[in-house]
C-alpha cells in the first residue's frame, strides 16, 4: 500500500533522535533502518516496529495488531507490531520504542549469523 509523503515526514520528524536513521522504499511501503538494521516499516500510513519476546508484550497489552502482508503475498503475520498512536505522538517515547526494535533487529541478525544449531 502507498505511504503518503506527509505521514512519512511526520514519522521521520518524530524519530529525529534515533541514531543513523534512514529509509528505503519497498513493496509500496517504506522500510525504516538504523544504519543497516531493518527495525520497522510503514505500510498504508501505518507504522510498525520489529518485535520479539523481549518487547512484544507492550504491544499486545495495547491490543496492537501484527503486520500482515497483502493477500497476494500469503506469508501470515510477521514479527512487526503496529505502533500505538499515542506513542507516535510522543517523540521521546517513540524513539525509546524504536531503540528496543533496533535491539531486536540486532539480536535477530546475531542469531542468523550464528547459523542453525547442530544436532548431536
Which residue stretches match the model-derived regions?
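Charge-dense, helix-prone N-terminal extensions
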Residues: 1-120
Amino acid at each position: 500500500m502507498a505511504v503518503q509523503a506527509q505521514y512519512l515526514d511526520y514519522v521521520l520528524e518524530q524519530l529525529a533522535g534515533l541514531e543513523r536513521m534512514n529509509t528505503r522504499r519497498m513493496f509500496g511501503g517504506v522500510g525504516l533502518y538504523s544504519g543497516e538494521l531493518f527495525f520497522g516499516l510503514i505500510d498504508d500510513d501505518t507504522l510498525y516496529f520489529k518485535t520479539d519476546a523481549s518487547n512484544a508484550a507492550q504491544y499486545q497489552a495495547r491490543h496492537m495488531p501484527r503486520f500482515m502482508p497483502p493477500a497476494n503475498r500469503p506469508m501470515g503475520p510477521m514479527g512487526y507490531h503496529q505502533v500505538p498512536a499515542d506513542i507516535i505522538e510522543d517523540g521521546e517515547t517513540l524513539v525509546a520504542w524504536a531503540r528496543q526494535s533496533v535491539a531486536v533487529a540486532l539480536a535477530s541478525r546475531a542469531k542468523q549469523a550464528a547459523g542453525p544449531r547442530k544436532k548431536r
